[in-house]
């Protein structure tokens, strides 16, 4: 989320700077809401790029759910990021 807002080109930024990244956050862009297939960011590709760097740390689901069931939104986000 933060990288897209600040710089864009997420996968290039991950590849260029992964040695300096300690953890990642997810959130839908725009709006910082649930992550899904309608957002600016395609998290399956992003997660594959993160995985390809050998990252062994944490990925925080840090979004503000709009739907009525926050746990269901979290489950969908985890499933989307499970590559």
Short names for language-model regions:
Residues 1-83:
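Histidine-acidic metal/acid-base catalytic patches
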């Amino acid at each position: 989320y933060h990288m897209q807002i600040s710089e864009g080109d997420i996968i290039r930024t991950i590849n260029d700077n992964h040695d300096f990244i300690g953890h990642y956050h997810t959130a839908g862009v725009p709006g910082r809401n649930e992550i899904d297939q309608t957002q600016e960011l395609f998290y399956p590709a992003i997660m594959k790029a993160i995985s390809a760097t050998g990252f062994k740390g944490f990925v925080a689901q840090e979004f503000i759910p709009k739907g009525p069931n926050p746990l269901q939104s979290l489950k969908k986000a985890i499933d989307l990021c499970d590559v």
